[in-house]
Amino acid sequence: MELTRQLFRKYKTNVFIITRTVFDKKQLRELDELSKEVNDAGKMMLVAVSINAIDSISICENPDLVATPMRRISFIKELSAIGLHPILMLRPVFPNEVIPVAECEKLIEATSNDVSCVVSSGLGVNDSILSRLGMKESDFSYKENQEYLQGAIECEIKFVNVEKELAALHKKCTSLGIPMFEHSMPAINYVINMET
């Protein structure tokens, strides 16, 4: 938290933290103090918590290295309780056969009273990612003309077709009155404008 504080004091800009981990009580207190300092300077602090599955989490994350989904849900509630406007980062979304959409809908329901919005988008894969997932290219259907090279690395990324899954999540968010965005920047702008 100290590095974040130093960066804020140097640049005097909004602060956006994305995490899959959770903060202990001391860190949460420090976050609250920093949030007040940021707000006093006329800026805003946002915290996005990344969760994209409940029971199937081990498909995309090593459960020994990050907080459990239920603990992250509790963390979102803690952030809301101290006056922050947490964002649920529900991405990447996998095809229903890999991670059921119902799990993602449960995440939205469980955080609906505490998040300001949801950011949810599809899954981009390359050979390395497929290998880590224990899958092969033929396991998925892909969006047409949605390929790109990542940075300077010759690494072709293809986007898995999850339009049905995203539509279901958008419907769930709409039914609960929660805005859903595909990218972080519109979500950040939404929360900042919500406050002004």
Question: Where do the PLM segments sit?
Answer:
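Conserved AdoMet/S-adenosylmethionine-binding subsite of the radical SAM
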Residues: 1-156
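C-terminal accessory extensions appended to soluble enzyme cores
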Residues: 125-196
